[in-house]
C-alpha cells in the first residue's frame, strides 16, 4: 500500500487500535466521508505514508468512505496543488479531513485559510504536519503520543485554561535562564486536547497543549532560553546548544547561541516577503505541554505537546485571538518550566 513494504504495513496493522481510537474518541465519526491528504515523505521519513496507511485501514475497518490524495512536499510560500484544493472543495459539508504531511498543506487557493474553510463548511479535521522531521524509527513514539487517556488530558487542559483565562500576567522561569512575563489580561487560552467532535472543529494530532496570545503587540518582556527544539524555515530540529532570546516590548531584539544565525536567517526571509515585516519578530504565544505520552524528538507537532516543556511562538497569532497577523509562526521549546500565574506558582 502506497509503496510501503509488507513488513512496514504489518507493523502499522498491529497499531490499528491507536487509529481507531482517534476516529472514535477525538473525531467521533459516524458515517462521514473521510479525505486524507498526504505526500510521499522525505529522504529520512516515510511517516506521512505510514500515518496515512493507518488512517485508511482504520477507516475501512469502520466502513467509512475514504479517499486519499497526494501532492509534493510543500515548503515556504508554496501553494497547495490544484487537485488538492479541488478535492477539498468537492467534499460534502460536515466531512472529515486528515492531513499527514512532511511539511505543510501549502497556501489554500484564494481561501483565507484551511482552518477557516473547515469552520465555514462544518468539516472536522486532524492536522499532522512537519512529519518529514520524524525518522521512521520514531513511528511507535509518535503513536504513543496519540494513544493517551483523552479524558484525563482534557481535564488537565481545562484546568490550565481556566486558570490562564482569569490571569492578568503569566511569568515563566527555568533553571537554564528563562525569565519572561506575558501580559494576558483579557485574553483567552486554547486547550488543544483532541476534542474534535463538533462541526468545524479540528487541530493537531498528537495533541496536548494549552496556549495563549499576549495582549496586544507589546505584552511580553524578558528572556527565553530555548534548550529543547526550535522551528526554522527548514523545519523543526533539536537544539544542540541553548539559544537565548531577549524580548523587549513584545519583540525579539537579540539572539545568542550556536543556532542564532539560523533563526535570524529564517526571520529575515519572512520579513522580506511580509506585507508588514515589523510584525514577524513579535512574540505571539505562550504555551505549555501537557501530553504525558509525548517525548521531544525534533518534530514540533510532537515537541510542543510534551509534558514538562513550555514554548513560545514568534510571529502570527491572529487565528487564535491575538493582535498579530503575519506570514510566519514558529514555535520554540524549552525544558522544565515553572509557571507563575499572577505571582502564584502553577501545577501542571
Give the predicted meaning of each segment:
Residues 1-223, 231-232, 238, 338-348:
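Active-site bordering "gate/hinge" segments
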Residues 169-172, 243-246, 253-255, 310, ...:
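Short polybasic amphipathic segments
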Residues 213-264:
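Oxyanion-binding "anion nests"
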Residues 309-348:
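Intrinsically disordered terminal and processing segments
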